[in-house]
Amino acid sequence: KDGLARPGTARMLQWLERGIRLDPKHPGACHFYIHAVEAVHPERAVACAERLAALMPGAGHIVHMPAHIYIRVGRWADAIEINRHAVHADAQYFDGPHTPDAGFYSAAYRSHNHHFLTLAAVMA
């Protein structure tokens, strides 16, 4: 609310950055790093954003995550493209023959991908 990082944020960033140095392709570390830096220093997560979607191409939310960075740094075309892939990944999963109850994911995350796609398209 005041624009300041919460206590422990610097330490958390150290751990995430250490994890990324040890394994730059760790999808969890990149995912949480994007969330951790997107508001104030999105440029710090560009490298993670550029590799994350390919690490788990069938996981719509993970595929979408680079858009959090691309939108913040003005990479509108990349945000459009990545969200198209995220929407497709979700459709493949949820429209498949063994679809579980989508619950919260379908209500929130699937629409979130569409919202980001729309925002990027409007800004492009």
How would you describe each model-predicted region?
Residues 25-27, 59, 93, 110:
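Residue-level recognition of tetratricopeptide repeat
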Residues 6, 39-40, 73, 124:
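Structural motif corresponding to the intra-repeat A-B loop/turn of tetratricopeptide repeats
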